Every structure is written in C-alpha cells, then in structure tokens.
Amino acid sequence: MAKFDAHLKCSFCGKSQDQVRKLIAGPGVYICDECIDLCNEILDEELIDTQAKINNSPQVKKKLPTNNSDKSIPLELTSIPKPLEIKTFLDNQVVGQESAKKILSVAVYNHYKRLAWRLKEENKENDSNDLQATKLQKSNILLIGPTGSGKTLLAQTLAEFLDVPFAVADATSLTEAGYVGEDVENILLRLLQKSEMNVDLAQKGIIYIDEIDKIARKSENPSITRDVSGEGVQQALLKMLEGTIANVPPQGGRKHPNHDCIQIDTSQILFICGGAFIGLEDIVQKRLGKNSIGFTTNPDESKINAKKIIDSRDALKNLEQDDLVKYGLIPEFIGRIPVCAVLDRLSKETLESILTEPRDALVKQFKTLLSMDNVELNFEPESVEAIANEAFKRKTGARALRSIIEELMLDLMYTLPSQEEVKEFIITKKMVDKLFLSKIVKLPAGSQRIIKESA
C-alpha cells in the first residue's frame, strides 16, 4: 500500500506526492498545492483585467461614486424657497389637503435651512466654542390618508420643485436582512442613482417611502416568530431614519462581504413615509368610544365624542401615537417620525376640482390628446359633476377619475382618428349616466358632433 502511495502525482504538473506539500485527491484526479496557487493567480489577474475594462467604459465612468457636488444647494437664507412659495407650487398641482401641504412646506424649508446651517458650521474655523454650537436635527414626516388622497402626488410634485435629490421607494418589497427581498439599503441606492452616484449630494436628499403601513406587524404584542417583512423591516429602518453610516452595495441586491460598498451618512437625509393605514380610524373610534363610557363622564364631553365617532373621516384628526402602536408600528419606529400629517378623504366637490383645475388635470390631458387629432373636446359642467359623483361612489379617491374617463372615452377615441371631418366633441351628463350606450353619427365637416342615445 505504501508503494502505491509513492507513485501518486499531480495530474497537472506531474510532480509526485514527495515533491509537494499537499496533494488533494478528486474523482480519478489529483492536484497539488502549487497548481492551486497558480490557478488562484490566474483568476485574480482575469478579475482585475475585467474590472478595469468595466471601470474604463464610458457608461460606468458616469456612475462611479464621487464626492463632488454638481448641483448647487441654496446656502444663503435669502435663496432658500419660503414655505409660502413651496405651498403655492403644490397648490398648482394638488387640490385640497391644506394641512398636509403646509406641513410639507415647512418641513422642506427647514430641511434647506438645516443643510445651510451645517455647511456654515463646517466652514467655520475650529475654536473653543465649537462644542457649544447648536446641532440641528431633522424631523421625519408621516403622511396618513386613504387611497387616492394625494400622498404620492404630493411627493412627486415636491420632486419637481426641489433642488435636492428626491427618491421614491416602496416598502412592500423590503425584507429583513438575510431573507428573499430587498434590503433597506436599496432605498439609499435609489437616492444615490438620482444623485448620479454623487455621495455628497445624496446625503442632502429627501426619500419618500410609500406603503409604509404594509410593514406593520400583525398584532400589537411582540411576536415570538419571525416577521421578516413587518417588524423586521421596521427594526432595520430605525438607524437609517435616525441617522447612521449605511453601507450601500453599488449594484443593488444583497450585500456581499467581498464586495465594496458605498458609505452614506443618513443624518441629513429627510424621510417622508406615507400609507393608507386601512382600519386605523376604527382603532381611534374605539378609543374615543371607551372615553365616553362611564358614570363619571361629563355629558357635554360625551356628546362631543359621540359626534366624532359618527363620522369616521374625522376620526384620524384625533390620532395619537398609541393608535399607531395598536395598528402594528413599534414605538421606536414611531418615535423617529415625530411629524404626522393626516390627509382628508376627497369629497365630491374636491373631485370636481381635481378634474379641471390642476396643471395636469384629466380634462386638460384628454383635451390635449384630442387636439392632436384636430378635435376640440369640451365637458359640460353637469358631466364633470356626474363623473365626480361616480368616482366618489367607488371610494378609491382620485384614481377612480381616470378609470371613469378612460371608460367614457374608449369608443370615442377609437373612432375619432378615422373621422377627420369632425372638429368638435361635447361630453354630456347623459353620456356619463349611460356609459357605452352612445353612438357617433357622422356629420358634414365643420359641424358639431351629435350624440344619439340608444334605447
């Protein structure tokens, strides 16, 4: 047996077992430690060459992380947009929600001032009074409102107005580290991409996290089982919301110990979280109902609470942090979002205004579309009211408006491109009441289009 072992040799270099330190056996093959080292050197050289080619390519050169700021942040107080100016811009695109717009305007204004103050402190010469300088901390914002009330639209409109990077993320795809899904650091990667991979600029940005209510834990009490997409995500977001040095993988996905990460300081990034929080008003109503029960309750106070309970739309105006805890948010997470804005449910009158008043109103959009076919589109006031009433019944907010108009305009937009002689079209209330029951009758060129209702 010893004689057989003496004839073992490396299948690659041919050296015998006595000539090498280690000989590793495989299925019918042997390799020595020297050949293993040589293979590792070859792989390392190829990896370096490949990485160099990637880094030298024009596409990647533009996306490499940098600390040089290309965009100018307002540094003087006089150049910072005032809250009234920010709200005026929001008014042009978002109808209603006055309280939420006021809160967002003040928060963005303070965000600009905090950046200017920090830069001013950094430019000061170091002296003995530096330790006494006031440190300005950020106040993250929580937007609560029913679906279609304008939470995402407010965030998108702010993105148009701001000179700082603005990124929108979805909380539903986030999971705790180590599980299938996105890490919370991928939120910062979106902001970094919006900043054209400029780290210094990204650290001054704003992030809007949508559907934040979807990461609420299943019950108020801590669970003994893993909640990887609920409480686990809240725990992972804590330090990011408060301010920390986060390691972000430049290519996205999961972090790898052998891959380089980009470090981003989140202490100056403003986070705005939004969610519908379906069922939260029931928790508030239940609490208000308990307060109005008992022999020692003030009768006048009981009447006030009873009125609050009747209208669920007003229930969220009495929201407290304990209600959010019962909904499923952990106290530590709520504490890091001190500012809370509640958006109102859209009324019929507000829906009518949304159809016609904003810059990108649906009526204006469809008028523009039909003008490309040389057709003038008009809506009777009664038809706008009927569309708003139908949208209000569907209880999906402003999103129902587009669905209704798309249904209403489908047949019309199907036939319009082929009817070059028609120059004008009027949407009437009867058409809204009887969707898809109208027929288009061809008329001589230059005349107004007539709608013939079917029986």
Curated annotation (Swiss-Prot):
Pfam families: AAA_2 (PF07724), ClpB_D2-small (PF10431), zf-C4_ClpX (PF06689)
Domain of life where this protein originates: Bacteria
Entry GO MF terms: ATP binding; ATP hydrolysis activity; ATP-dependent protein folding chaperone; protein dimerization activity; unfolded protein binding; zinc ion binding
Boundaries of every ClpX-type ZB domain copy: 1-51
Keyword annotations of the record: ATP-binding, Chaperone, Metal-binding, Nucleotide-binding, Zinc
Positions of Zn(2+) binding: 10, 13, 32, 35
Protein name according to UniProt: ATP-dependent Clp protease ATP-binding subunit ClpX
Gene: clpX
